[in-house]
UniProtKB/Swiss-Prot annotation:
GO MF term list: structural constituent of ribosome
Name of this chain's protein: Large ribosomal subunit protein bL17
Entry's family note: Belongs to the bacterial ribosomal protein bL17 family.
InterPro entries xref list: Ribosomal_bL17 (IPR000456), Ribosomal_bL17_CS (IPR047859), Ribosomal_bL17_sf (IPR036373)
Lineage: Bacteria, Pseudomonadati, Pseudomonadota, Alphaproteobacteria, Hyphomicrobiales
Assembly description: Part of the 50S ribosomal subunit. Contacts protein L32.
Length: 141
């Protein structure tokens, strides 16, 4: 019987699930919005919410915990610098999931998962250059 078994398997091994969630969390933090299937979106939400809470804590141990989970130092830097400060006064509820119809090939239910109050201009690697340019302009002024 399946009593008391939390979480979805998503037809993957435990290691595959862990790697997939790490990659999805990194993409979500980098781009601030991703399109995925509804069950994956529902599973990734608590993972990223806990990462944002780690970012708000801001100490070295929290940063190391975040790096051990998503394994991308640049994304962790964005999480701790930009995203954590944006949600400093908010207690949870950093993400929203919106249903986005069905996928053409297999009719899987899709969802958009995004940060509430997200930066609409965030575009991954291009965004890092833009943020750096804005920081330099702010320092010069």
């Amino acid at each position: 019987m399946r009593h008391g078994k939390a979480g979805r398997k998503l037809n993957r091994t435990a290691s595959h699930r862990k790697a997939m969630f790490a990659n999805m969390a990194a993409s979500l933090i980098e781009h601030e919005q991703i399109v995925t299937t509804l069950p994956k979106a529902k599973e990734i939400r608590p993972i990223v919410e806990k990462l944002v809470t780690l970012g708000k804590r801001g100490d070295l141990h929290a940063r190391r915990q975040a790096v051990s989970q998503i394994r991308d130092v640049a994304v962790v830097a964005k999480l701790f610098d930009a995203i954590a400060s944006r949600y400093a006064t908010r207690n949870g509820g950093y993400l929203r999931i919106m249903k986005a119809g069905f996928r053409q090939g297999d009719n899987a239910p899709l969802a958009v998962i995004e940060f509430v109050d997200r930066d609409a201009d965030a575009k991954g690697s291009k965004d890092r250059a833009r943020v750096a340019a804005e920081a330099e302009a702010a320092e010069a002024a």
